[in-house]
Amino acid sequence: MPLHKSAEKRLRQAARRNERNRARKKELKGVLKNMQKLIDANAAKSEVEAAYKAAVQKLDRLGVKRYIHPNKASRKKAQLTKALNNYTPTAS
């Protein structure tokens, strides 16, 4: 337990920030999983493109605001772009 008032405040702030960071990263994981799920399910190209757009927007936002490292955001965007460009839905 903190002994000083300022240390107590820092503890509260850290807890709030930790919760916020976890929520943002969880949102990102959901968006990325959604795109991967659409690719695995052999969805229409337009659906995958919409998921790609949402994922790139989320990555850009989190990279700029430093929730994730900007280079990680850039790397993930490149991976998603490559997956989208190589994606061709097969008739099943």
UniProtKB/Swiss-Prot annotation:
Pfam families: Ribosomal_S20p (PF01649). The keyword rRNA-binding applies. GO terms for molecular function: small ribosomal subunit rRNA binding; structural constituent of ribosome. NCBIfam families: S20 (TIGR00029). PANTHER family: 30S RIBOSOMAL PROTEIN S20 (PTHR33398), SMALL RIBOSOMAL SUBUNIT PROTEIN BS20C (PTHR33398:SF1). Residues 82-92 have a biased composition (Polar residues). Residues 1-21 have a biased composition (Basic and acidic residues). Residues 1-26, 73-92 are annotated as: Disordered. This is Small ribosomal subunit protein bS20. It comes from Chlorobaculum tepidum (strain ATCC 49652 / DSM 12025 / NBRC 103806 / TLS) (Chlorobium tepidum). HAMAP family: Ribosomal_bS20 (MF_00500). One of its GO terms (cellular component) is cytosol. Binds directly to 16S ribosomal RNA. Belongs to the bacterial ribosomal protein bS20 family. Keywords: Ribonucleoprotein, Ribosomal protein, RNA-binding, rRNA-binding. InterPro entries: Ribosomal_bS20, Ribosomal_bS20_sf. GO terms for biological process: translation. It comes from the Bacteria.
